[in-house]
Amino acid sequence: MKRAFILVLDSFGIGATADAQAFGDVGSDTLGHIADQCAQGLADNAERKGALQLPNLSKLGLAMAHKESTGRFAPGLDERADIIGAYAHAAELSSGKDTPSGHWEIAGVPVLFEWGYFSDKQNSFPKELTDRILARAGLDGFLGNCHASGTQVLDDLGEEHMRTGKPIFYTSADSVFQIACHEETFGLARLLELCQIAREELADYNIGRVIARPFVGPGKGQFARTGNRRDLSVEPPSATVLQKLVEEKQGRVVSIGKIADIYAYCGITDKVKATGIPDLFEATLEQIKQAGDNTIVFTNFVDFDSAYGHRRDVAGYAAALEYFDKRLPEVLALMQEDDILILTADHGCDPTWPGTDHTREHIPVLVYGKKVAPGSLGRRDTFADIGQTLASYFGTSPMDYGKNFL
């Protein structure tokens, strides 16, 4: 019975890539810098203290993959762990360092074209675009029109939004158009309708995602995003390994978290909603228990990126990693004879790095299975090696990019 479980620790980079200079990210290292700050006592909070402790990830080869990427061991990680999995560090072939590019490449389809971007920090959006969106939505104005941190923009504009009913439009260094609205005063359904209008009006701009950012709270300092985020992505430019499994093998692909949104529902047969790392983990365990032959269970743990990476919260990121690590044996205990588990990431988001954007880094590729030989798989030239490996494993037609590493 063929089953594969892909767990994406969103933003968990393990050291800058050779092309990081083009992105302003030379020296970035999400894992290494978190470990450094933990070792120095600079990442203590109510949940954790001291050196970074990731014994189970280290057994799967995380410490070794990081060393092969950066030339050094991350302090606190067990460099003498008995390795039980295959491990690698992978570079990105895609032109960007964004979520769709990383995920599509993982599934065998790198993004070799250039996304459209809203590069101006202020007055970011063309007036003709926003005029069309507002007219179709029956709105008389909007707030923002800038690059912004998703949490800061709520403090800056949330109260005015509640008072005026004007949505908050903002963007970032990624190919995104983001809309933040209060779930209670503006309405969630209305926000999602507005995002659909924006998605349609952005057809000629080559923007990767429109993101609905609903929030709640009475006022500044008390606003909080909810779990009802939606990502409206464009479709991948060609068939991913997910689509091939479904179409060629009549297989199942179970999306947990925002996976379905990222792939614009292409190649997704089942969607499980869960928010927050504990709930995402529980949903993953439940779906592994239920999974039959020719099934991929695919989970994105977005909080590593959204709650800790972008917010530059080193202690929070470290605590979340340690929580994930402690629960990892629960996944391993459910593995059957022919199963494959792949732990990976889609880009970096170094919480010690200037700004709030992603970082261009290698991703870990940690592979475990009872029939997987432990040891180094070296440096992989593209995330698409994961997709090609899955294509070979499930017996679908091969992908155009990537090499099978098993």
From Swiss-Prot:
Q: Give its E.C. classification number.
A: 5.4.2.7
Cofactor(s), names only, from the UniProt record: Mn(2+)
Which pathway does the protein contribute to? Carbohydrate degradation; 2-deoxy-D-ribose 1-phosphate degradation; D-glyceraldehyde 3-phosphate and acetaldehyde from 2-deoxy-alpha-D-ribose 1-phosphate: step 1/2
UniProt subcellular location: Cytoplasm
An annotated Gene Ontology molecular function: magnesium ion binding
Q: Which residues bind Mn(2+) 1?
A: 10, 346-347
Extract the InterPro entries matched here: Alkaline_phosphatase_core_sf, DeoB, Metalloenzyme, Phosphopentomutase_DeoB_cap_sf
Task: Quickly give the catalysed reaction.
Answer: 2-deoxy-alpha-D-ribose 1-phosphate = 2-deoxy-D-ribose 5-phosphate; alpha-D-ribose 1-phosphate = D-ribose 5-phosphate
Q: Its GO CC terms? A: cytosol
Q: What does this protein do, in the record's words? A: Isomerase that catalyzes the conversion of deoxy-ribose 1-phosphate (dRib-1-P) and ribose 1-phosphate (Rib-1-P) to deoxy-ribose 5-phosphate (dRib-5-P) and ribose 5-phosphate (Rib-5-P), respectively.
Protein name as annotated: Phosphopentomutase
UniProt source species: Vibrio cholerae serotype O1 (strain ATCC 39541 / Classical Ogawa 395 / O395)
Q: What gene does the UniProt entry assign to this protein?
A: deoB
